[in-house]
A protein has these predicted regions:
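Aromatic- and acidic-residue-enriched segments that line the glycan-binding/catalytic groove
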Residues: 47-58, 70-84, 114, 120, ...
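Polar, glycine-rich mid-to-C-terminal structural blocks
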Residues: 111-187
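Active-site-adjacent substrate/metal-binding segments within catalytic domains
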Residues: 1-66, 72-98, 112, 235-242
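Substrate-binding clefts and catalytic carboxylate motifs of secreted carbohydrate-active enzymes
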Residues: 99, 163-242
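Conserved, mostly hydrophobic/aromatic
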Residues: 50, 99, 122, 131, ...
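Active-site flanking residues adjacent to catalytic metal/cofactor-binding acidic residues
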Residues: 59, 103, 201
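Solvent-exposed loop/turn segments at secondary-structure junctions
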Residues: 41-43, 63-66, 103-107, 137-139, ...
Length: 242
């Protein structure tokens, strides 16, 4: 996941193919072949580089965690125009394989219908790709959307498909680490009502102690206040590695 288009040195994403090839090759070195652009769409150089390297990309509309997604006519028109432009702009890139309407969207009745209509619009324009109403839409509480081509979430209603949650919940926090935990039972339950691809959402969200030496790497426009605060608290508790 390329989280939130955060580029601390420049404040904007790389704009050239060589820069993107360098970044994507780093992903590949970690065994990654699929990149989700969290609530944003990167510039065309990203898609061109991914085409050359055989990487797969999932852009998203720039919509994140509202309580009433697409609830107004103005927002619906705006995001529909964004969707149409995105599909027209990137349609010829084979690396562009999936798309969602945004991150952790929630909506009221009218917004829900507009979410369905946006997915239908995308399918009509270009049926060669996979579309979904969101990544972790409704935080998984409403289950799989039957009109979406795939489902990405932390859970499907009360069926958990992620190892850790906020508040120190999840089996990674509650049980001794082991490699014998699978999601077979969870998927068997989901398959009773949904047969399309299922992805677990943001599985790497667990607490680790930061590498505070990275503070010396910030030379651009960003001030890593969060890391500085964490370091201060770690020092106060006598936990700073020596």
């Amino acid at each position: 996941e390329a989280n939130c288009a955060e580029y601390p040195e420049t404040g904007h994403p790389p704009m050239t193919i060589p820069e993107w090839k360098e970044m994507l090759l780093k992903y590949r070195s970690y065994g990654i072949n699929f990149v989700r652009f969290h609530s944003h769409c990167e510039p065309e150089a990203a898609f061109a580089a991914a085409d050359e390297l055989g990487m797969l990309l999932q852009p998203e509309l720039s919509h994140w965690d509202p309580k009433d997604a697409f609830g107004t006519e103005e927002s619906y028109r705006y995001y529909r125009a964004e969707l149409v432009d995105l599909l027209k702009t990137y349609a010829n890139h084979p690396s562009f394989v999936m798309l969602t309407l945004g991150n952790e969207l929630q909506a009221q009745d009218e917004g829900r219908e507009r979410m369905r209509e946006l997915v239908r619009t995308a399918k009509r324009m270009d049926p060669t790709r996979l579309y979904a109403n969101g990544s972790n839409a409704f935080y998984g509480e409403e289950g799989c959307d039957p009109e979406s081509d795939f489902y990405t979430s932390q859970s499907c209603k009360d069926v958990v498909i992620r190892g850790t949650f906020s508040g120190m919940r999840g089996y990674l926090n509650e049980n001794y680490p082991s490699a014998d935990r699978t999601y077979d039972e969870a998927m068997a339950e989901i398959r009773k009502e949904y047969q399309k691809p299922v992805f677990s959402f943001e599985v790497g969200q667990f607490e680790v102690l930061p590498d505070f030496e990275e503070l010396e790497s910030f030379h651009g426009i960003s001030d890593p206040v969060n890391l500085k605060l964490i370091k201060k608290r770690v020092e106060e508790r006598g936990l700073l590695p020596t």
